[in-house]
Amino acid sequence: MAGKKEFSIFDHVLVPEHRVLSEEEKKALLEKYKITLAQLPQIKASDPAVKALGAKPGDVIEIKRKSPTAGVYYYYRVVVED
């Protein structure tokens, strides 16, 4: 069998831009919306995008999505164990 091919999932047209927030950004986000980490939507540590970013449980991922009506909007998820 041939060797395993590797590619960046972020190069695919359907995968929006992802990034891990710094601790300061995470704290500011939680304060801005007056929420806790438990109130954020979750994303599993086994998600291919999370693996590609090297994020670990407790990290917050910012997802930049494009919308035909809203232009660009940001979505936040907290990384959890599988």
Curated annotation (Swiss-Prot):
Which cysteines in this chain are paired by disulphide bridges?
A: none
What organism is listed for this UniProt entry?
Pyrococcus furiosus (strain ATCC 43587 / DSM 3638 / JCM 8422 / Vc1)
Q: Which InterPro entries match?
A: Arch_Rpo5/euc_Rpb5 (IPR014381), RNA_pol_subH/Rpb5_C (IPR000783), RNA_pol_subH/Rpb5_CS (IPR020608), RPB5-like_sf (IPR035913)
Assembly and partners are described as: Part of the RNA polymerase complex.
Task: Write out the catalysed reaction.
Answer: RNA(n) + a ribonucleoside 5'-triphosphate = RNA(n+1) + diphosphate
Q: What is the lineage of its organism?
A: Archaea, Methanobacteriati, Methanobacteriota, Thermococci, Thermococcales
Protein name from the UniProt record: DNA-directed RNA polymerase subunit Rpo5
What UniProt keywords are attached to this protein's entry? Answer: Cytoplasm, DNA-directed RNA polymerase, Nucleotidyltransferase, Transcription, Transferase
User: Which gene does this sequence derive from?
Assistant: rpo5
Keyword Transmembrane listed:
no
